Amino acid sequence: MTTHHRVRSSSNSSSNNINNNNNNNNNNNIHQLSSSRTMIDHHNSDPTSSSSPTNESQIHHFSNSNYNYNYDDVDDSTINSNSTNNNNKNRNIQNNNNQNISNNRDNNNNNINSNLNNQTNLINYNDDEDYDEDYEREIEDDEEYEEIGDEESSSGIGGDSEFNDSLNGSKAGSRNREIWINPNIELMLKIALSTTKNPYYYHNIAKKLEEMVGRPISEKLVRSQMTNLLGKNSKFFKHPYREIKSKPGIPKSLINSHNLREKQIWESCKNLITEIKSSPNYYSIGGGSFPTNNNNHNNASGASSSTSTPSTSSASSPASSSSSLSSLSNNNNNNNNNNNNNNNSNSINNSNNAHSIYPNGSNSGNSKNSSSSSSSSSSNNGNCSSNYPSPPLSENHLSLSLPSISKSHSNNTGSFGFSLSSPTTSSSNNSSNNNNNNNNSNQFFSSISDQQPSKKLHVVSPPLQSLQSIQPPISQLNNNNNNHHNNHHQNHHHQNHNHQHHSKKRKIRSYDSKHLEKFQVIREKVIETLSEIDDIINSMKNDSDNDNSEFEDC
């Protein structure tokens, strides 16, 4: 009976060990399972041994008839019951282990699939926007030019797997690798050429490319590819593509067709890159800043330069492309003023001393339609009007109605009645100056009208006789003041215009009223000085008359 007790206690202790180990560590259950099934065997005397054989070998061990067991003093029913209990427990433990293993396998598969999806969504080709421009560092990378949207091959041509494998093998061993042209890169460039420039430029390209290739394309990848292709130090032209030489096992016709196709794709991509750089939609790819209203602004400039935004991949002529480039560059430099017109009356500091810095209505008909100016001036009967692109009309000072200035050419009379809303108020001040034949005498007052749109100037003109008697000094004074004022306004306008291109909202700082007050004080001083000079002249005339009378008396 001692043996019977030993077997029962051994089986119980082994089952307890199994239950404890099942709660602590599932991986050790298999080993404990093996030890529990060998406890009846006299060859294994240690019930806690963890170095027992596996389940498969242990099952084979029990099925082997060569082993002899000494169970003479052991109750058969006890052995059967213990083995049945152990088998049930072992079966439950094995089921739990299998379930845990399958769950872990499913989790691992899910993690692997998610990682693969992330890797395919963000294809690792220069994903870092601040990538190093050094080509030697780029050579060390595993892939020079990763596929966009094509999972079949990394050679960029698709098709025969054997051919692609041989190409990949040859590419991996080359140090002076050249870029493999990807047909999807050509597709991306075509989409980029037809995509309108706006803050969602890369996003729109990525979405269109995603629809074309049928798989997710990240916006970051498109940005890095476009930066590499259109960047200042683009390696696309330095290392365009590699011609495949004869290789064993590859038909020569297939190699020739590959080389021909690669060359054709590269030529197409090169033309597309040139066209993108010369199109109105092109901007500095590496900058990353987008003016908010740049789209409509450049559409207006493009319309004036006979170059339309291309909607397909067909290339425009170099002449039209260069004209659109000059249109874009000159629009920023000329500040929407007709400074490049042949007629000097429309420039800022013109020889005719026009009434304001805006295009003069009398001579604006002679101004030519230049692609360098996005604001075209047109007027009739002396009224000045300018047409500007749509974005600034509602947000900056260009939307304000310009002062209406009437000018008669028959008697060369300058009238300086100004108004912000209607030209009718100019007639109220014209009556006092109809006999004034000098245009320069009114420029000083008319130049003030452009600065304070919310106020009207009620000019009190000096005596007409005094104005006519001292025209040369006043003309010099007004010329100096007008030139100084125009230069100041030009600089002020230039600064504000540059600020508008780099800000989200087109706002302009309101003109300080102190300037207007200064002009008013100067005007009053001038009028006072004129009256004093007029008095002196009158007194001199009186003295001369008296002298003449005395001479006549003699």
From Swiss-Prot:
Bias (Polar residues) ranges:
164-173
Give the Basic residues compositional bias ranges: 485-508
Q: Which domain of life is it from?
A: Eukaryota
Q: Which residues form a coiled coil?
A: none
Q: Where is the composition biased (Acidic residues)?
A: 139-153
Any one of the GO CC terms: core mediator complex
Q: Where is the composition biased (Low complexity)?
A: 9-30, 46-55, 63-125, 293-387, 416-449, 461-484
Q: Where is this region: Disordered?
A: 1-127, 139-173, 293-395, 416-509
Q: What is this protein called?
A: Uncharacterized protein DDB_G0281497
What organism does this protein naturally occur in? Dictyostelium discoideum (Social amoeba)
